[in-house]
Structures are given as structure tokens and as C-alpha cells.
């Protein structure tokens, strides 16, 4: 049925995985996410026979609820289009479902389920009371007018509003969903419900319930986590060459924070290619090109003396000490990792969700390269969403410095928890196993306590 080697799983876990494949045979991304978690939780399952007695693992891999709906909207010429919307409410053991909305042509149920499944454990690692979920639509905001995006968002929220709420399900942004889209959706929710429920969405504007540091959070948090990894190796970002794939929100603010800590970020990318800037990426120019003009990295290269744009090839061929994949799933293949290792990479930490292929992860670990999975290293975004929910509940707003300090502490704590759990289960230094074991244990123990629901 697939290339997954179930002989590496215990018989009980292999049975769970084969059931997932049998029920949803076409969901490759979801299978990959489940397999990666099951590979690492065997020692936990062995210590806790009650998990098997209560079918905890079987229940965790099955969403509590998955919604699919049509989203009709009219373009500026009056033509009607129909897109497909999704919301997977995966697990609410620890709190309201929490996870972003992705608007991209590639969106399908498999991708939303993989993201929602990862979100369960990522949210558990933050220490904040949040369950896991994810949603989105196969709509492409690129090339659309503001009015078209608004009409789509209003149609999308008209259906989604039936299923969300501050104590039920709290969506946020993701690829293709930024402050503009969150604003349009929040406005429609407020109009439909006749209530100002600030806590129903996160990633809001600062004047209407948003949090300082939310925009920066995923990128900053990634670098805070990577800095802890470097410190564990007796070093720091100071003087390091860094490559960051992507040039969206996560990549921009990871670049900014890494350079604040003394690193030189020498390359960023987008779907058109990558740019090499040996002097260090000019973050102000990158923000102007990507956030203001919504341009390409080739525009950055055209305006930045000494920068070189490369349309073909791989950004992973650029020599670096630290690699931060911040674009999309499965962007870092085995060939990319082999190039990184050949050029002496010391650390890889994920800013995107599942950007490194399973074969590439194994190659990194075999080579002794420190590697952090996204569920740990990119948890800063959802952590700060959780902080935004706290502020909304208290009808208050913290200063940037206070929120950033809380974010920093959360990332330090996630690192410590991941490392300690890996050591506890005999896999010291394995960040993948440590993160999976720590997150899974918290969710599973809570489900045991709550009974069969």
C-alpha cells in the first residue's frame, strides 16, 4: 500500500498504522505524520498498558470531527467560483481546538489532517491549554483583488462560524492567511453572531484584540529554540552562517532574530528560486519586497548590490552552519540534506510543518547533525496565539517586551522538556523522539483521565 516500513513498528502500533492506511488510502501526508509519531512512541506504549486497554492510540489518530464544505464566491467580473473548505477538529483533550487556516491550491483533506495531527502535540508541548485542529481551503489568494479575497473570506466564515468559538475552536492564520484575511473573517463572524468575541480567532490586528509579537512569534520562537540547541552544544548563533528557506512570515522573522543574535543569514527563497547575499540579508528590504509589494526574491536581488538570484537549483547547496527550512512540507529532501552535510551543517531546525522528508531526517541523525522537528521548534506561533487568547480572556493587552519574554521562556521550556523526555526514555539527543514522547504522553494521560469519550 505504501513505502512505509511497518516492520519497524511494534505489532500493536503496526496494526494502528495499517488501519489508518486502510481507512484513508489516498492521504499520503497524513500517513507520513502518523508514521513518524508511531515510530518513536513504542517505549511510552510499553510503559503504559492502559493506553492499549482504552484504545488511546487508535483514538488519537482519528479526528473527533472533520468538516468539508463548499465556499461559493463571486469575482470582480461577477463570475461565480466554488472552492472547497475544511476544518478538522482533531483532539480537544487539553483545551479548545487550536490551529491555523491555510488558503492554497494544494489544500486537501490529507494535508489538513497531517497539519491537525501535528498540531495536537505541538500545542501540548507549549504547556498552554489548547487542543489540536487545522483548516483551510483550496483557494489561492495570489492574483486576487482585496475585494475578491474579502468576498471569499466572508463566504468561508459564513459556514465556519457554525463550528467555532472562543471555548470551542480557535482558528488562526497559516500559508495564504495573514492579517488581511483574519480581519475579513473576524468581521464576518462578528456580523453573523452579533458579538465581539475577540477570542474566536488569533492573529488579529493590534487595535481589535491582537497581540504584540504574534507576527514575529513563529520565526522568533524558532531561533530561540535553535539557540537552546546550540547552547547545548556549547556554542551560539554569533558568527554562524545561516540559510533560511522561504521568505514569508516565518522566514522573515527567523532571519531578523538570527541576525540580532549575531548570525549572518546568507540565503532566502520563494517558489521562483533563491537569493544569496553574502553580506547578510537586508531584512528591511526583504520585508518591503514580500510584505508590502508582495514581490519575488528576484526583486530583492535586483535592488540589493552584491545579491545573486538563482532560478534553478537548490538553496540547500549554499554552505551554512545552520539551516532553517521555513517554506512548506517536504521541501528538504535527502539530496538537500546530503549537500548540507557535505558543506558542514551543524544544526537543522524546522520553521515549516514537516519540511524534512523521512529519509532526510534519518540521514541527519546518522550524521550526528542536531535536528529539531517543527512540532517543537516552530511552536512559538501557536504559543503566542495561546497568549493572545489569554489576553482576550482578560480583556487586556501586554507590551511587546512582555509577550516576547513569555514566548522566549516557552521555547526554553519546550527545549528542556524535549531533551529531558528523550533522556528519560533512553534516546538522549533525539529531538524527534523527545518531542513526540512529551507531547503524546500529556495528551494520552489526559484522555485516560477523561474516560471513553
At which residue positions do the language-model features occur?
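Adenosine-phosphate binding glycine-rich loop
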Residues: 2-33, 229, 341-453
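Flexible, glycine/charged-enriched surface loops at secondary-structure junctions
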Residues: 28-31, 49-54, 127, 164-173, ...
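Glycine/serine-rich phosphate-binding loop and adjoining beta1-alpha1 elements at the start
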Residues: 104, 123-238
Amino acid at each position: 500500500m505504501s513505502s512505509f516500513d511497518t516492520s519497524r513498528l511494534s505489532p500493536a502500533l503496526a496494526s494502528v498504522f495499517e488501519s489508518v492506511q486502510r481507512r484513508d488510502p489516498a492521504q499520503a501526508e497524513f500517513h507520513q505524520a502518523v508514521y513518524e509519531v508511531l515510530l518513536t512512541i513504542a517505549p511510552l506504549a510499553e510503559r503504559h498498558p492502559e493506553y492499549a486497554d482504552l484504545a488511546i492510540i487508535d483514538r488519537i489518530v482519528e479526528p473527533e470531527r472533520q468538516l468539508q464544505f463548499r465556499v461559493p464566491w463571486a469575482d470582480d467580473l461577477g463570475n461565480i467560483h466554488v472552492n472547497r473548505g475544511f476544518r478538522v477538529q482533531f483532539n480537544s483533550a487539553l483545551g479548545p481546538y487550536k490551529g491555523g487556516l491555510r488558503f492554497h491550491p494544494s489544500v486537501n483533506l490529507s494535508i489538513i489532517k497531517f497539519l491537525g495531527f501535528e498540531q495536537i502535540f505541538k500545542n501540548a508541548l507549549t504547556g498552554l491549554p489548547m487542543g489540536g485542529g487545522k483548516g483551510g481551503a483550496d483557494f489561492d489568494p495570489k492574483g486576487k483583488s482585496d475585494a475578491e479575497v474579502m468576498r471569499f473570506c466572508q463566504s468561508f466564515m459564513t459556514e465556519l462560524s457554525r463550528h467555532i468559538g472562543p471555548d470551542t475552536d480557535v482558528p488562526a492564520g497559516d500559508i495564504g492567511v495573514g492579517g488581511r484575511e483574519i480581519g475579513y473573517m473576524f468581521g464576518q463572524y462578528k456580523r453573523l453572531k452579533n458579538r465581539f468575541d475577540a477570542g474566536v480567532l488569533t492573529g488579529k490586528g493590534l487595535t481589535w484584540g491582537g497581540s504584540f509579537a504574534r507576527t514575529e512569534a513563529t520565526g522568533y520562537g524558532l531561533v530561540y529554540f535553535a539557540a537552546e540547541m546550540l547552547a547545548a552544544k556549547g556554542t551560539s548563533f554569533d558568527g554562524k552562517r545561516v540559510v533560511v528557506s522561504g521568505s514569508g512570515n516565518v522566514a522573515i522573522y527567523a532571519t531578523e532574530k538570527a541576525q540580532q543574535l549575531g548570525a549572518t543569514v546568507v540565503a532566502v527563497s520563494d517558489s521562483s528560486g533563491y537569493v544569496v547575499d553574502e553580506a547578510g540579508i537586508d531584512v528591511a528590504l526583504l520585508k518591503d519586497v514580500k510584505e508590502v509589494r508582495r514581490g519575488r526574491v528576484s526583486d530583492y536581488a535586483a535592488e540589493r548590490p552584491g545579491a545573486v538570484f538563482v532560478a534553478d537549483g537548490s538553496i540547500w547547496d549554499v554552505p551554512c552552519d545552520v539551516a532553517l527550512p521555513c517554506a512548506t512540507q517536504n521541501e528538504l529532501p535527502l539530496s538537500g540534506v546530503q549537500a548540507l552535510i557535505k558543506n558542514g551543517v551543524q544544526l537543522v531546525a524546522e520553521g515549516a510543518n514537516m519540511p524534512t522528508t523521512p529519509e532526510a531526517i534519518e540521514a541527519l541523525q546518522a550524521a550526528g547533525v542536531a535536528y529539531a522537528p517543527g512540532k517543537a521548534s516552530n511552536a512559538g506561533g501557536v504559543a503566542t496565539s495561546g497568549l493572545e487568547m489569554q489576553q482576550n480572556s482578560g480583556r487586556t493587552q501586554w507590551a511587546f517586551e512582555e509577550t516576547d519574554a513569555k514566548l522566549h521562556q516557552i521555547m526554553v521550556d519546550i527545549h528542556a522538556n524535549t531533551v529531558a523526555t528523550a533522556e528519560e526514555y533512553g534516546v538522549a539527543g533525539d529531538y524527534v523522539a523527545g518531542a513526540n514522547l512529551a507531547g503524546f504522553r500529556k495528551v494520552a494521560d489526559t484522555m485516560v483521565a477523561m474516560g471513553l469519550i
